[in-house]
Amino acid sequence: MQTLTYAQARLAAFLFFSASGLAYGLFTARIPSLKEQTGAASDELGLVLFALGAASVVGLSGAAALVRRFGVKAVSLAGSLIFFFGLLVAGLAEQVAVLAVATALVGLGFGLLDVAVNVAGIEVERRWKKASMNVIHAGYNVGVVAGSISAAVFTGLAVAPLWNFVLPCAILLLVLLRAQHYLPVPEELQQSSAEKPKTKSRVTGFVVFCGVLSSATYVTEGAAAEWGSLFLHQVQGAPESMAALCYGVFGSCALACRLIADRLRAAYGDVNVFLTGAVIALCGMTIVLFAPHWTVSLAGYAVFGTGLAPVVPILFALAGRFGGMPLERATSVVALFAYGGLLFFPPFFGFLAEHWGLLRSLSVTLLLLTGLLAGGIVLKRGDKRRRGV
C-alpha cells in the first residue's frame, strides 16, 4: 500500500474545502436567476435562504456521529455529493418549494462536509506536526472566487443556472473521487465499530470557548459579506459599482493571508498569530466605520479581512489538539458555533439598523472583535501555563 505523504493529504483536504466554496459561490451568485426562474417573492426567498442555514445546522450537529460511524472519507464525499445534487435540483426548480428543498440539501451537505474535512485537516497537522489549517481553509476562498467568476461568465453568456451548476461541479466531482483516497484518517477512527468505545464524552469548556470565539469571528465576517456594500453605498457615499467590491476586497485579502498564515504559525505560534490577527481585524473595522471617505473604508475592509483570516482555522486546530474530546466531536462543536454565527446572526444587523442606523448597527462588530481580542489574551495565558512559563 502506498504511503500517504503530507503534500497529498494537505492537497486532498484543500480540494474538498474548495468544493464547498465553489458550490456556495455558484449558488449565491445565481440567486437572482433562481429567483426569476421560480418567481419567488423577496419574503419567500428569505425563507429559502433560511432553509440553507437550518439544514447546515442539522448537518453540523449530526456529522460527528456519522464520521465516527462511516469515516472521514465517506462523509466528506457524501457531503459533497449531497450539495452538488442540491445544486442540480435548484437548477431544475420552477417552484419555490422545490428551490427550498434544494437549498436545504445544499446546506445539509455543507454541514456534513465541513466537520469531516476539518477532522482531516486537524489530522494533517497532528500527524506531520506542520501548521496547515490556514492553507487548507484557503481552499474555500479559492472555490468561492472560482464559483463567482464562473457564474459571471455563464450569466454573461445567458446560460441557465442548471448548466452553470452541472459543468463545474461535474469536473470537480471527478477530482474529489480521486482525492478522497488521500484524506488522512485519525487513528482513533480507524478502529472497527466493535472496537470503538461506546461511552459519550462530555463537551469540554475549552472546546465551547473556541466555539464562542469562532462564532464571534464569523458574525463579524457575515456583517462584512451581507452589509458591507450597503454601508459603503448608503453611509459612506460610494458609487454602487465600487461598493460592490467590498466583499471581494475582503475575501481576496483573507485568501492571501491564509496562504502565508501557516508559515507565521510555525514561526511565532498559534496564539501569537491569533492575537495579532485580532488586533489587525479590530483596527481594520475601526477604519471601515469611521473613515472620512469611502475609499479609506474600502481599504479598511482589506485590513479587516487580512486580520480575521487566520483566526478560525487556528481555533479548529486548538480545539482538536487541546480540547480533551474525540476529534470529530470537538470539530463538530466548534463548527456548530462558527456557522451558527455566520448563518443566523448577520440578519439581526438589519433589525438594529432600522432602529439605530447602519453605522451604529455595525459598530456592534467592534464589541465582538474586542471580545475576540480578550479571548486571545485568555488563550495566551493558557498557552504559557501549558509551557510552564
Tell me the role of every PLM-derived stretch.
Residues 39, 71, 92-97, 237, ...:
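Helix-breaking motifs and short loop linkers at transmembrane-helix boundaries and internal kinks
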Residues 29-43, 226-242:
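Short amphipathic helix-loop junctions that connect adjacent transmembrane helices
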Residues 103-139:
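Cytoplasmic helix-loop-helix junction between adjacent transmembrane helices
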Residues 136-184:
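Helix-loop-helix hairpin linking two adjacent transmembrane segments in secondary transporters
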Residues 268-315:
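C-terminal transmembrane helical hairpin of 12-TM major facilitator-type secondary transporters
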Residues 59-71, 155, 257-269, 353-354:
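Helix-to-loop junctions at the C-terminal end of transmembrane segments
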Residues 73-76, 274:
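Primarily marks hydrophobic transmembrane alpha-helices of the MFS/SLC 12-helix fold
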Residues 53-54, 141-146, 251-252, 256, ...:
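Short hydrophobic/small-residue motifs within alpha-helical transmembrane segments
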